[in-house]
Amino acid sequence: MIRDVAGSYRRALQATVEHYSGWRPLPAEIDALKGEGQWNNDWDASIELLKRHGSPLPERQSLIDVFSGFYFGGDPEASPETWSGYIGDEPLLVDASLFQSIHTLGWSWGFVSGAEPPSARFVLEQRLGLESPPLIAMGDAPDKPDPTGLLQLSHDLLSGSGATTVAYLGDTVADIQTVIRAKAEWPGRTWISLAVAPPHLHHQPAERSAYEQRLKDAGADHILTSTMAVTDWLRSTAQH
């Protein structure tokens, strides 16, 4: 939850489905699908929406290429300067000071992202200016809610530190289920699921409240008002 993807990944998902079917799913329909907890991968989500709409299903690689064309607008492995796609429409939700604050509060940090590595590295390293940030991106581990990536990252960050608490912040049911599954696989650690509603809902009080309730129902331990609010939560935990 460090960038607003309503105009990029969500838009590419809509455009991909429309490309194959002529039907453009509404944001609320995508939210409902994501709320099921198993469609964190936007390629899979695109295929599932096509299936439910009764549209012929394309070959997976063909769909990935179409999606990538909308999202990157160029070769994902090429220089970001050559990209002309929706990735250029991603307002940042945080700045680099957040991670310095987290470090100052005594916590290590890293990222488990469902984004392709070029996209994740671009936002973390070039836009936020983070140097070699700990990152598990698409392809480095199975898609969430499989906890492998979170378990791997937490092991790397906590190894030798003596710390036993892991807090993971996400904005989907799949993120919460990832924490729950990690807890089942590694019960010796304290796992905390932090959740936040995606920014496209922040100006829709009723929809946001309903979305946050779904996150709570899925097992979120704490609902935050924004990603930047994580430092307030960390300070509050230090006082208890």
Question: Where are these predicted regions, by residue range?
Answer:
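Substrate-recognition "cap/lid" segment bordering the active-site pocket of phosphatases
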Residues: 110, 115-167, 173-191
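Short, acidic loop-to-helix structural element flanking the phosphoryl-transfer center
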Residues: 70-111, 115-122
